[in-house]
Amino acid sequence: MAKYFGTDGIRGEVANSTITVEFTQKLGNAVGSLINQKNYPKFVIVGQDTRSSGGFLKFALVSGLNAAGIDVLDLGVVPTPVVAFMTVKHRAAAGFVITASHNKFTDNGIKLFSSNGFKLDDALEEEVEDMIDGDFIYQPQFKFGSYKILANAIDEYIESIHSRFAKFVNYKGKVVVDCAHGAASHNFEALLDKFGINYVSIASNPDGLNINVGCGATCVSNIKKAVKEQKADLGISLDGDADRIIIVDENGQEIDGDGILNILAQYSDICGGTNGIVGTQMTNMSYENHYRANKIPFIRSKVGDRYVLEDLVKYGYKIGGESSGHVINLNFGTTGDGLFTAIQLLAIFSQAYKPVSEFKLQGELMQQTLINVPLTKKVAREDLQKVASDVNDVEKRLGNRGRVLLRPSGTEPVLRVMVEADDKSLATNEAEYLVEKVKQKLV
């Protein structure tokens, strides 16, 4: 079991968890030392979101890297997918993002990309963790690394997207965008300006403390309200580091990551094509049934965009994602990318002249009830055996009307209890039953 890494990097409350100046410096030094051991290029890229803690954590990371003899190129405040993109483009050994994604501003963390733009696999994470717990290493003969700032990183990213999609995007509707006061602030607007989109921007004034507060992809009520007030045709909401996207239609109705994947699957020729779709254990059964009916291969991965990516590579598919809004298209990038996904959707909406609501899967979706149960410590999968008989009882009662999923969070001491059924009250009642059993046996 990983000591520091969760499903999406390392994350926690600043100064009251792993996320301290001392740890972040050791992490930088550990990765730098590993780069030296493996004879990778002595050069990495770093970026950050808008949290007030991002600056001093970044410089702690840089100092550890520099001490190990690694040169650092700082992109400043940029979306997470921009760091992955630039890591590949500039042939860096690794890319770091100081971010806690959709979490509150008091949290922060580090996402780490390898030279191919993918998040680290479990084996490499274990190597990094072993190095963190070892000695701090200074590069011999004072051959320390350098530190430089690249101010135009977002321009390179925007130009790459524009060169691929300029001929497809001609969207005439009115768009509202919610940047979550995060890394997309001003950067997403620059991308939309490049494509000539008519938009209104909200939650795009970061002050270091307001990231994700009452806005962004985890608070869709903000974008729903704005779409109605602006009488807009489309709403696009990103999270704090812009690797997630949720959209709403002209009626203010939400289309989550599953719904977005379904739209991309229908128009995959515009998005570069794919032989199938990768969803997750959380993907609504209605979409799985829809893909099957339309002879579109569909695979469920474990929850976490790194696992979606692993299955995309394993099965040779190009498009996949999560209900939460992480959407990956390997025809362009290597990680969840809210900005690029938005442009793909605008390209699709430009080609088919109908309201956004008509792109959604028609009919009622299976009803999901998801309850997060706080725990005193992280729960291992083997701990779930304590409630296995209770889960089995619920599955028997549901029969073919639904399913059950218990999933430990990869980033916090929380157990997610999800029940899906063709009736909302049935899903809710069974989920609440399981929550009580979890509280009795695991809390």
Swiss-Prot record:
Protein name: Phosphoglucosamine mutase
MF-aspect GO terms: magnesium ion binding; phosphoglucosamine mutase activity; phosphomannomutase activity
Enzyme nomenclature, EC number: 5.4.2.10
GO process terms (BP): carbohydrate metabolic process; peptidoglycan biosynthetic process; UDP-N-acetylglucosamine biosynthetic process
HAMAP family from the UniProt entry: GlmM_B (MF_01554_B)
Cofactor: Mg(2+)
SUPFAM superfamilies the record matches: Phosphoglucomutase, C-terminal domain, Phosphoglucomutase, first 3 domains
Any one Gene Ontology cellular component term annotated for this protein: cytosol
Residues recorded as bearing Phosphoserine in the entry: 101
Active-site residues (renumbered): 101 (phosphoserine intermediate)
Enzyme class, UniProt record, top EC level: isomerase
Recorded family membership: Belongs to the phosphohexose mutase family.
Cofactor note: Binds 1 Mg(2+) ion per subunit.
Enzymatic reactions: alpha-D-glucosamine 1-phosphate = D-glucosamine 6-phosphate
Keyword Membrane (UniProt): no
Organism: Francisella tularensis subsp. holarctica (strain LVS)
Pfam families, A to Z: PGM_PMM_I, PGM_PMM_II, PGM_PMM_III, PGM_PMM_IV
Sorted UniProt keywords: Isomerase, Magnesium, Metal-binding, Phosphoprotein
Post-translational modification: Activated by phosphorylation.
Function text: Catalyzes the conversion of glucosamine-6-phosphate to glucosamine-1-phosphate.
Chain residues that bind Mg(2+): 101, 239, 241, 243
InterPro entries: A-D-PHexomutase_a/b/a-I, A-D-PHexomutase_a/b/a-I/II/III, A-D-PHexomutase_a/b/a-II, A-D-PHexomutase_a/b/a-III, A-D-PHexomutase_C, A-D-PHexomutase_C_sf, Alpha-D-phosphohexomutase_SF, GlmM_bact
